[in-house]
C-alpha cells in the first residue's frame, strides 16, 4: 500500500472500491496495523515514523475507531459499554456516562444489552463509548455498509447531527459516493492501495481527473480519446469528434467522461460531435428512466439517464436522433 495525503479539514472522506486499501489506511492511523515505512502525524503529534522508530500504541493515540459492526461488548449494558474505558473515580464516571447517554439520545436504554438495540441505537452507543475517551480523531470504517438504502440515509443524517459539535477530525471510508459527498469537506480517492486524487469534495466530483476517480464518483460513460489538437478529440468507441471552443485539451488528456444525466437530446439535424442514437434498451425506475445505447461493436453501452419529466417528452416525440455533449460537462481524464 502506498497512500500519502495531507489535509487541514475536519471532515475527510476516503473513497474507493472494495479491497483497495481504505480500511487498512484507517487501521494504520489507529495503530492496529503497523506500516513498513512512512509517517503518520495528526495535529502535530507523530503517531508513527519508521525512520525514527516511533510507534505509539493504539491506546495512546487518542484515536476513536468505529468498526463496521460497532464492536459492542454483548454481555455489557449500554451504560457499561460506554464507561468501559473510563479511568477516573466512580462518581466522575457515572456523571460522564449520564452526559453521553443524554447527548446521544440513549435515555431509557441504559440497562439494555446490544442484542436488544436497533442498528441506530447500537451506533449511537458505540459513538458514545468513543467520546468517553475524548479522542482527537474519529475513524469511521464503512459504518453503513450492511444497511439498506433508506436506513443508510437516515443514519448518515443522524451521525452528522451527533458529530456536529465535535471539534476533532473525522475520517470516514466508504465505497458509496453519496455518503462521501454528503459527509466530507475533502476526499481522498484510493485505487489498488494508491492515493490518486485528493481535494475538496465538490472539486473532485466536478473534475475527477482520472478514470478510476470518475467511475467512483458516478460517471457511467468513459472512453479513451485520440487528441487531434488543442481543441479537438476523436472518441473511437462512440464515433464522435468533439471540438471545444472554450476549453483547451492538454496533451495529458487520454480519455473523457460524460455523466449520464448531462446529455442533451437532439432531434433533426445532427453532427459528428453528437452520439447517434440507433439501437437501445431501457429500464424504468420510480423517478427516472435509464437508456443503454449501443455504440461501436465490442464497446460498452452508452448510458443516458432521464428524469420523469423528460421521459414524458420522449413518450410524445420518440427517441432523439442523437445526444449532444455540453462542453462544460465533459470530463478531461488523464488515464
Where are these regions (language model features)?
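Catalytic "switch" loops of ABC-type ATPases
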Residues: 32, 62-63, 67-75, 176
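Conserved ABC transporter NBD signature motif
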Residues: 38-50
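ABC ATPase nucleotide-binding domains
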Residues: 77-212
Amino acid at each position: 500500500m502506498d497512500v500519502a495525503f495531507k489535509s487541514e479539514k475536519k471532515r475527510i472522506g476516503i473513497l474507493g472500491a472494495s479491497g483497495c486499501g481504505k480500511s487498512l489506511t484507517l487501521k494504520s492511523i489507529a495503530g492496529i496495523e503497523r506500516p513498513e515505512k512512512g509517517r503518520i502525524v495528526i495535529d502535530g503529534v507523530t503517531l508513527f515514523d519508521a525512520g525514527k522508530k516511533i510507534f505509539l500504541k493504539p491506546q495512546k493515540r487518542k484515536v476513536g475507531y468505529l468498526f463496521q459492526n460497532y464492536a459492542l461488548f454483548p454481555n455489557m449494558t449500554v451504560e457499561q459499554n460506554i464507561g468501559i474505558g473510563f479511568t477516573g473515580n466512580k462518581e466522575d464516571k457515572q456523571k460522564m456516562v449520564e452526559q453521553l447517554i443524554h447527548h446521544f439520545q440513549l435515555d431509557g436504554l441504559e440497562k439494555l444489552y446490544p442484542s436488544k438495540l436497533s442498528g441506530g441505537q447500537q451506533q449511537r452507543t458505540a459513538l458514545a463509548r468513543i467520546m468517553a475517551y475524548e479522542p482527537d480523531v474519529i475513524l469511521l470504517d464503512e459504518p453503513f455498509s450492511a444497511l439498506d438504502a433508506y436506513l443508510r440515509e437516515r443514519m448518515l443524517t443522524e451521525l452528522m447531527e451527533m458529530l456536529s459539535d465535535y471539534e476533532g477530525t473525522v475520517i470516514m471510508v466508504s465505497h458509496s459516493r453519496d455518503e462521501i459527498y454528503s459527509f466530507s469537506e475533502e476526499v481522498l480517492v484510493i485505487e489498488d492501495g494508491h492515493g490518486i486524487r485528493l481535494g475538496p469534495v465538490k472539486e473532485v466530483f466536478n473534475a475527477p481527473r482520472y478514470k478510476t476517480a470518475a467511475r467512483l464518483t458516478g460517471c457511467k460513460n468513459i472512453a479513451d480519446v485520440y487528441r487531434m489538437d488543442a481543441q479537438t478529440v476523436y472518441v473511437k468507441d462512440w464515433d464522435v469528434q468533439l471540438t471545444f471552443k472554450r476549453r483547451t485539451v492538454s496533451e495529458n488528456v487520454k480519455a473523457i467522461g460524460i455523466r449520464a444525466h448531462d446529455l442533451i437530446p437532439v432531434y433533426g439535424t445532427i453532427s459528428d460531435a453528437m452520439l447517434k442514437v440507433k439501437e437501445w434498451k431501457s429500464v424504468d425506475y420510480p423517478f427516472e428512466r435509464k437508456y443503454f445505447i449501443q455504440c461501436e461493436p465490442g464497446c460498452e453501452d452508452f448510458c443516458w439517464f432521464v428524469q420523469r419529466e423528460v421521459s414524458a417528452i420522449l413518450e410524445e416525440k420518440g427517441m432523439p436522433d442523437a445526444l449532444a455533449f455540453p462542453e462544460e460537462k465533459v470530463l478531461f481524464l488523464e488515464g
